C-alpha cells in the first residue's frame, strides 16, 4: 500500500499486510486457551512446527533485510505474554518428563532470546528503525513485566531448569547443543537484566514491576543468583565459554548502585534518605528565595523601559521592572541581554546506551538491597577471582566471543566490586568497634579474595588499555579504566593499613611497581590536562584519579626517601639522535656511540624520584581549568567531591606557591559566588568553612600581588603561560641558559698505514666521498683556492714593498651555508680533514659557531699543493683492496679524551673528612694528594706482585693485627705526605675582596721590614759582620732516607728533625723569598771573626741532610755573582775541617739496595757574606 497516498482518516500500514497475515496465522496456529478451562493453555497440533516457522521469519526476514517488521507483528500479537510464557508454565507443571514438551520449551526459549534482545540504536538508522524502535522498547518492558510477575509460576526458574541437564554434563562430554542451551539460558538472563523503562516514553502500568529492585528480587527468589554463583566459581573448569556472558549479567545488575547505601543497615539507610530529602527541600527553598528577589510584584503588570547612562556618555536601553531595584541589578540585566555567538565545536553526540551509562543512580528498596548485598558478599568470597581472571585472559587474547564493549564492562565491574569489598571491610570494622561479639572472634580476612586484579598482569593490561583509549579518544572506555585504577589504588592503600603483615608487604610491593613507571605518571597528567567537554562522568573520574594518585604518591615518597622511577625519555631521544646522526658513522666510532647509547639508556631508565618536581606538573593552566570545570558543578557535588577540588586548589596556591594561576576573573568570580552567592554553598555543610577560608586567602593574596605587580590587573583577563607566571611571581623574566653541545670525538688516521700528511689527506677524502660528503670536501677545496689567491696577492705586494715585511694575515674560513656551518662542529671527519690541511680554530672553546682560520705560516704554494691533492682525490676513483676498508683506518685519537682528563683533575681531590682523625693534621685540612705517575705505579704494582709470589710459599698469611698495622702505617704515610703539599685549590673568590685597614697595616709592616733589611745589609757591607736574623733558622739535610732506615735513626736525630719541622711550620708566615741566616751560616767571614754565635752552631751541623735540598736549590743567577769564585774556594776549604764523619751505622750498608747512600753536606750558598736558603720544601 502506498503510504504517502493514504488518507488522513485511515491508519498508515507500517508493516506489509502479507507479512502481518503470515505471522498472525502462525501465532494463531500455535495454540490458545480452551473455552472449558480458561486458565489452561492448549497447544495446537503443530505447535513445534509453528515455533520453528516463527524463528525462521525472524531470522530470514528481519535480520537478513535489516528490518523489524516481524518483531513488530509478534509484539502486536502478544506472542510472549499470551503464548510463550503459558507454554513454559505448562511444561514446568506437567510436561518435564515428556521429550516432546521439552523440545517445545526449548523452542520457546529460542524465541524469547531474540525478542528480548536489547535494541541497539545503529549509527545509520532507516525509516523502518525509527518507526518500530519505540514500540518494541515498550513491548520489551511488557515482556519483562510478564516474565518477572507471571502469576504464581517462576519463569526464570523454568528457564534454568531447561539448562540444568546441559550443566550436569561434564565439560569434556558436552556437545555443541549443550553449549548452545547454556548460552541461550545466560543470554535470556542478561536480556532481562538489561531491559529498563525508557524515560522518554510513557510507561504503561507500575514502573516498580520492571525496576532494578524487582529484577534483583526475582533473581534471588527464582535461584538465578545461585546459578550465577555456581557458574562464576567454576568458570575456569566447567564453564570456560560462558565467562563473558556472566560478566555482562553482573555489570547490568550492579551498575549505578550506590555501594555505601548497599552495606548500610535499615537505620542508617533511613537516616541517609532523611538527610537527602532535607537537602533537596533546602535546595528548593534557596531557589525560591533567589527567585523571589527579582520576581515580579503584584502590581508589576505594566511594561517598563529605561535609559541607562554609562560612564562614556553613551545611553543603553533596558526593559523590565526588575531593573528598577538598584544599579547593580540594572547592569546585571544589561549583561544578560548581551549575546555572544561562541563558535561551538561540532562533536558527535554521545549516545547514552545501557553499556556506558555509569553515572545514573539507581535506588533500591530494602528487600532488593538485602538480596543484592547477600549476593555480592558471596560472590566476593567465591567467584571474584575465577571470573575476572578468566575474562581478562580472554580479552587479552582477543577471543571470538569478546566484543569491544566487554572491556569497558570488565573495568567498571572490577571497580564496583573492589569498592564493595572496601566498604564491607569498613562496616565490619565499625561493627567490631561497636562491640559485636560475633565479629570479634573472627580474624580479619586478607585481601586474597580480590588478589586476581592486584597482580602484575592486570596492571600491564590496565596501563595498555588506558593508553590505547587515551590515544584513540575513547571517552567511555577511558572513564571505566580510570575508575578501576582509582579503586585499585584505594584498595592498595587499605591493604597497607591492614593488621596482617603479609598484606602490608604485598601493598608495598604493589605501590613500588605502580609508582616505578614514569609513563604512568605522565599518562595521568596528560589525562587531566586533556579534558575538554567529555562530560561530567569523565571529569569526575579523572579528578578523582589525580587526587588519589597524588595523595598516595606523596605518602609513599615520604616513607621511601630513596625512591627511584624508570624513565624512558632520554633513552628514546638519544636513540632517535643516533639513528639520524649518520654523518659520524664509521665502524669504530659507531661502536663507541652504541656503548654511549647503552650507558645513556641505563642512566635514563632509572632516576631518583622528586615529588615536588612531579607535583609541579599539575601546576599549569590546563589542569586548573579541568578542576575549575569540575568545581562549577558545586551545587550537585557531595562532600567528598568538594573536598577533592578544595585540596587541589590548596596545593596549587599554598604548597606549590603558584596562586598566580588562580588569578583570573572567571575563577575569582566562581569562588566568590560559591561563598557569597547568588547560589552559594550551603553554609551548614562541613566543607563550607574550609572553602570560605581558602577563598579568603586567595583573594587576599591576589590583592597583595596586585600592589606588587600592577601588570596583574591586565593579566586577570587571560590564562597564564609559564613566562607570565614566573614574571608575576618574581618580578623579572626567567633567565634560561642553553646547554652547549659537546664536540665529537677527535679522530686520527692510523699512523701505521699512513706516514705522511698527504697520504692521510687522501684517506680522509676517500672516506668522506664514500660517506656521500663530497660537498664538504669541495667546500674545503674552494676555501683553499680562495685562501691561496689571497695569500699570493699578499706575497706579491710584499715583494714590491721595500720596508720591513709584515707577517702574513690570517684568513678566516667561511662556510657557504648553514649545514656546512653545523658540519664544521658536528662532523668528526670534516674536522679531521680541516686539521690535516692545517686549518686552525681560534680560541680554546670548542663550541658551535667557533671560528676557523688559515694560519699565516701557510704560503700560497702550500695551499696550492694541498688543494691539488684534494682535487686529485675527487677526480680519481677510489681504489682499495677488497680486504681493507679505508674507513677502518680512521680511529679515535688515543690519549686525547677531554672528558677523562677533566674527570682526572678532580678524581683524586680529598676534601678532608669530618672524622676525629683529621684534627691531628698540622696544616689543617688535607690538600689534594700528590699521586704517583701511572708508569711508576704500574712498575711498583708489578714488583709487589712478584714479591708476593716469592713469599707465598715461604711465609704464612698475615693475621688481622698485621694487616691492621700495615693499613695504619700506610694511612700515616699518606697523611704525612699530603700535609706537606700546598695547593691552589683553596684560593677563593673572596680572597680578592679588599680591606683598606688591613692593606694599610700590611704595607706598614712591609715598609718596616724593608728598612730593617736595608740596615742589616748596609752594616754587613761596611763591617763584614752578619747579625742574627732569626732564632728560628732552619737546617737542611743532604741525603734522602728511605722508610726502611727511619726506624734505625737515633732518638736525638728524630727529635732534632721534629724541632726543625715545627720551626718551619711556625715560620710559614715569614717572607717566602730569601731567608738570610747568620748564626748558623758557615761563611768564611763569620768564621774569621770568631763570632760566639757560631760556637753552638756546630752542634746541629752533624745531622745528615736529605737530597730534597739539592732538588730545591735554585740557580745562582742573582746580582751577587762577583763573590761566586770566592765562595767556591772558601767552601772547599771548609768542607774538610768542619764536616764530621758520619756515624758508622749510616755508612756500613753501602752495597745494600734498600739502604740509601748518604751524601756529604753540600756547601752553603753565599751571597755577599749571607747564606741564602729557601724556606719551602
Curated annotation (Swiss-Prot):
One of its GO terms (biological process) is DNA replication checkpoint signaling. Residues 583-597, 911-921, 954-963, 1108-1118, 1146-1155 have a biased composition (Acidic residues). The keyword DNA repair applies. This is Topoisomerase 1-associated factor 1. It is found in: Nucleus. GO terms for molecular function: DNA binding. InterPro entries: Timeless, Timeless_N. Forms a fork protection complex (FPC) with csm3 and which is required for chromosome segregation during meiosis and DNA damage repair. FPC coordinates leading and lagging strand synthesis and moves with the replication fork. FPC stabilizes replication forks in a configuration that is recognized by replication checkpoint sensors. GO terms for cellular component: replication fork protection complex. Belongs to the timeless family. Residues 575-597, 791-815, 874-1001, 1021-1177 are annotated as: Disordered. PANTHER family: PROTEIN TIMELESS HOMOLOG, TIMEOUT/TIMELESS-2. Component of the fork protection complex (FPC) consisting of tof1 and csm3. Keywords: Cell cycle, DNA damage, DNA repair, DNA replication inhibitor, Meiosis, Nucleus. Residues 1086-1096 have a biased composition (Polar residues). Residues 791-803, 981-991 have a biased composition (Basic and acidic residues). Disulfide bonds: none annotated. It comes from the Eukaryota. The gene is tof1.
Amino acid at each position: 500500500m502506498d503510504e504517502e497516498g493514504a488518507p488522513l482518516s485511515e491508519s498508515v500500514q507500517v508493516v506489509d499486510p502479507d507479512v502481518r497475515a503470515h505471522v498472525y496465522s502462525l501465532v494463531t496456529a500455535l495454540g490458545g486457551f480452551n473455552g472449558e478451562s480458561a486458565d489452561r493453555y492448549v497447544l495446537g497440533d503443530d505447535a513445534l512446527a509453528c515455533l520453528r516457522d516463527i524463528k525462521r521469519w525472524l531470522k530470514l526476514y528481519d535480520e537478513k533485510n535489516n528490518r523489524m517488521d516481524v518483531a513488530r507483528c509478534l509484539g502486536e500479537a502478544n506472542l510472549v505474554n499470551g503464548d510463550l510464557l503459558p507454554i513454559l508454565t505448562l511444561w514446568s507443571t506437567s510436561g518435564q518428563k515428556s521429550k516432546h514438551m521439552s523440545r517445545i520449551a526449548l523452542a520457546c526459549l529460542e524465541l524469547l532470546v531474540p525478542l528480548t534482545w536489547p535494541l541497539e540504536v545503529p549509527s545509520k538508522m532507516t525509516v523502518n528503525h525509527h518507526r518500530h524502535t519505540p514500540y518494541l522498547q515498550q513491548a520489551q518492558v511488557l515482556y519483562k513485566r510478564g516474565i518477572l510477575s507471571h502469576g504464581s509460576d517462576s519463569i526464570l526458574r523454568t528457564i534454568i531448569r531447561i539448562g540444568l541437564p546441559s550443566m550436569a554434563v561434564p565439560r569434556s562430554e558436552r556437545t555443541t547443543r549443550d553449549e548452545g542451551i547454556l548460552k541461550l539460558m545466560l543470554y535470556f538472563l542478561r536480556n532481562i537484566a538489561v531491559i529498563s523503562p525508557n524515560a522518554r516514553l510513557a510507561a504503561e502500568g507500575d514502573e516498580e514491576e520492571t525496576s532494578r529492585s524487582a529484577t534483583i528480587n526475582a533473581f534471588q527468589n527464582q535461584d538465578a543468583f545461585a546459578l550465577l554463583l555456581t557458574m562464576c566459581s567454576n568458570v575456569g573448569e566447567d564453564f570456560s565459554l560462558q565467562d563473558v556472558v556472566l560478566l555482562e549479567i553482573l555489570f547490568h545488575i550492579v551498575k549505578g548502585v550506590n555501594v555505601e547505601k548497599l552495606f548500610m543497615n535499615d537505620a542508617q539507610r533511613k537516616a541517609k534518605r532523611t538527610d537527602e530529602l532535607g537537602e533537596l527541600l533546602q535546595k528548593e527553598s534557596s531557589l525560591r528565595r533567589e527567585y523571589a528577589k527579582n520576581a515580579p510584584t503584584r502590581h508589576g503588570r505594566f511594561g517598563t523601559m529605561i535609559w541607562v547612562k554609562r560612564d562614556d556618555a553613551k545611553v543603553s536601553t533596558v526593559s523590565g521592572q526588575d531593573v528598577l531595584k538598584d544599579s547593580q541589578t540594572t547592569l546585571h540585566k544589561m549583561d544578560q541581554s548581551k549575546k555572544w555567538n561562541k563558535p561551538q565545536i561540532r562533536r558527535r553526540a554521545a549516545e547514552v546506551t545501557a553499556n556506558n551509562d555509569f553515572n545514573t543512580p539507581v535506588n533500591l528498596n530494602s528487600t532488593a538491597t538485602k538480596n543484592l548485598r547477600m549476593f555480592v558478599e558471596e560472590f566476593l568470597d567465591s567467584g571474584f577471582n575465577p571470573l575476572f581472571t578468566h575474562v581478562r585472559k580472554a580479552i587479552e587474547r582477543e577471543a571470538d566471543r569478546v566484543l569491544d564493549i566487554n572491556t569497558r564492562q570488565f573495568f567498571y565491574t572490577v571497580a564496583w566490586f573492589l569498592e564493595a569489598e572496601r566498604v564491607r571491610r569498613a562496616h565490619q570494622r565499625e561493627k567490631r568497634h561497636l562491640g559485636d561479639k560475633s565479629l570479634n572472634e573472627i580474624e580479619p580476612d586478607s585481601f586474597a579474595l580480590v588478589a586476581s586484579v592486584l597482580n602484575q598482569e592486570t596492571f600491564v593490561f590496565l596501563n595498555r588499555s588506558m593508553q590505547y583509549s587515551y590515544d584513540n579518544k575513547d571517552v567511555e572506555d577511558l572513564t571505566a579504566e580510570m575508575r578501576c585504577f582509582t579503586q585499585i589504588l584505594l584498595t592498595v592503600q587499605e591493604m597497607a593499613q591492614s593488621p596482617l603483615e603479609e598484606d602490608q608487604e604485598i601493598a608495598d610491593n604493589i605501590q613500588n611497581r605502580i609508582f616505578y613507571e614514569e609513563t604512568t605518571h605522565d599518562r595521568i597528567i596528560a589525562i587531566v590536562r586533556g579534558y575538554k567537554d567529555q562530560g561530567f562522568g569523565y571529569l569526575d573520574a579523572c579528578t578523582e584519579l589525580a587526587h588519589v594518585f597524588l595523595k598516595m604518591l606523596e605518602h609513599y615518597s615520604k616513607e621511601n626517601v630513596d625512591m627511584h622511577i624508570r624513565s624512558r625519555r632520554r633513552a628514546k631521544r638519544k636513540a632517535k639522535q643516533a639513528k639520524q646522526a649518520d654523518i659520524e658513522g664509521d665502524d669504530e666510532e659507531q661502536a663507541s656511540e652504541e656503548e654511549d647509547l647503552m650507558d645513556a639508556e641505563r642512566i635514563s631508565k632509572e632516576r631518583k624520584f622528586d615529588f615536588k618536581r612531579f607535583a609541579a606538573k599539575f601546576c599549569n593552566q590546563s589542569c586548573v581549568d579541568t578542576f575549575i570545570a569540575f568545581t562549577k558543578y558545586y551545587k550537585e557535588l557531595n562532600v567528598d567531591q568538594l573536598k577533592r577540588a578544595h585540596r587541589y586548589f590548596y596545593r596549587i596556591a599554598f604548597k606549590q606557591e603558584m596562586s598566580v594561576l588562580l588569578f583570573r576573573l572567571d575563577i575569582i568570580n566562581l569562588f566568590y559566588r560559591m561563598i557569597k552567592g547568588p547560589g552559594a554553598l550551603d553554609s551548614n555543610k562541613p566543607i563550607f568553612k574550609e572553602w570560605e577560608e581558602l577563598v579568603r586567602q586567595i583573594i587576599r593574596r591576589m590583592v597583595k600581588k596586585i600592589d606588587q605587580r600592577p601588570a596583574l590587573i591586565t593579566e586577570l583577563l587571560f590564562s597564564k603561560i609559564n613566562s607570565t607566571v614566573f614574571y608575576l611571581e618574581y618580578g623579572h623574566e626567567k633567565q634560561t641558559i642553553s646547554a652547549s653541545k659537546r664536540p665529537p670525538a677527535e679522530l686520527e688516521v692510523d699512523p701505521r698505514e699512513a706516514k705522511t700528511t698527504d697520504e692521510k689527506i687522501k684517506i680522509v677524502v676517500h672516506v668522506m666521498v664514500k660517506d656521500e660528503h663530497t660537498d664538504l670536501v669541495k667546500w674545503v677545496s674552494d676555501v683553499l683556492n680562495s685562501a691561496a689567491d689571497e695569500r699570493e696577492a699578499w706575497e706579491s705586494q710584499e715583494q714590491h714593498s721595500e720596508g720591513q715585511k709584515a707577517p702574513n694575515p690570517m684568513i678566516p674560513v667561511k662556510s657557504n651555508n648553514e649545514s656546512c656551518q653545523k658540519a664544521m662542529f658536528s662532523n668528526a671527519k670534516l674536522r679531521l680533514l680541516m686539521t690535516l690541511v692545517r686549518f686552525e680554530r681560534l680560541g680554546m672553546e670548542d663550541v658551535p659557531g667557533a671560528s676557523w682560520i688559515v694560519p699565516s705560516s701557510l704560503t700560497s704554494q702550500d695551499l696550492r699543493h694541498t688543494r691539488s691533492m684534494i682535487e686529485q682525490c675527487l677526480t680519481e676513483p677510489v681504489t682499495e683492496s677488497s680486504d681493507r676498508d679505508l674507513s677502518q683506518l680512521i680511529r679515535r685519537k688515543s690519549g686525547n679524551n677531554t672528558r677523562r682528563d677533566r674527570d682526572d683533575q678532580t678524581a683524586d681531590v680529598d676534601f678532608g673528612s669530618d672524622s676525629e682523625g683529621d684534627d691531628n693534621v698540622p696544616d689543617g685540612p688535607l690538600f689534594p694528594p700528590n699521586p704517583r705517575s701511572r708508569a711508576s705505579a704500574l712498575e711498583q704494582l708489578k714488583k709487589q706482585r712478584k714479591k708476593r709470589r716469592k713469599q707465598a710459599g715461604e711465609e704464612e698469611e698475615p693475621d688481622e693485627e698485621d694487616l691492621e698495622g700495615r693499613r695504619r702505617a700506610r694511612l700515616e704515610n699518606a697523611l704525612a705526605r699530603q700535609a706537606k703539599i700546598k695547593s691552589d685549590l683553596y684560593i677563593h673568590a673572596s680572597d680578592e675582596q679588599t680591606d683598606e685597614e688591613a692593606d694599610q697595616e700590611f704595607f706598614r709592616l712591609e715598609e718596616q721590614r724593608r728598612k730593617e733589611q736595608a740596615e742589616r745589609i748596609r752594616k754587613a757591607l761596611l763591617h763584614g759582620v752578619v747579625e742574627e736574623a732569626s732564632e728560628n733558622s732552619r737546617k737542611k739535610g743532604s741525603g734522602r732516607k728511605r722508610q726502611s732506615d727511619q726506624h734505625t735513626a737515633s732518638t736525638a736525630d728524630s727529635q732534632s728533625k721534629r724541632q726543625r719541622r715545627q720551626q718551619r711550620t711556625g715560620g710559614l708566615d715569614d717572607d717566602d723569598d730569601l731567608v738570610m741566616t747568620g748564626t748558623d751560616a758557615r761563611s768564611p767571614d763569620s768564621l774569621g771573626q770568631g763570632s760566639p754565635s757560631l760556637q753552638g752552631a756546630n752542634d746541629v751541623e752533624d745531622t745528615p741532610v736529605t737530597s730534597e735540598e739539592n732538588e730545591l736549590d735554585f740557580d745562582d743567577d742573582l746580582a751577587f755573582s762577583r763573590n761566586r769564585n770566592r765562595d767556591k774556594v772558601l767552601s772547599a776549604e771548609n768542607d774538610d775541617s768542619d764536616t764530621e764523619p758520619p756515624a758508622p751505622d749510616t755508612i756500613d750498608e753501602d752495597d745494600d739496595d734498600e739502604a740509601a747512600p748518604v751524601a756529604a753536606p753540600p756547601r752553603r750558598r753565599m751571597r755577599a757574606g749571607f747564606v741564602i736558603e729557601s724556606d719551602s720544601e
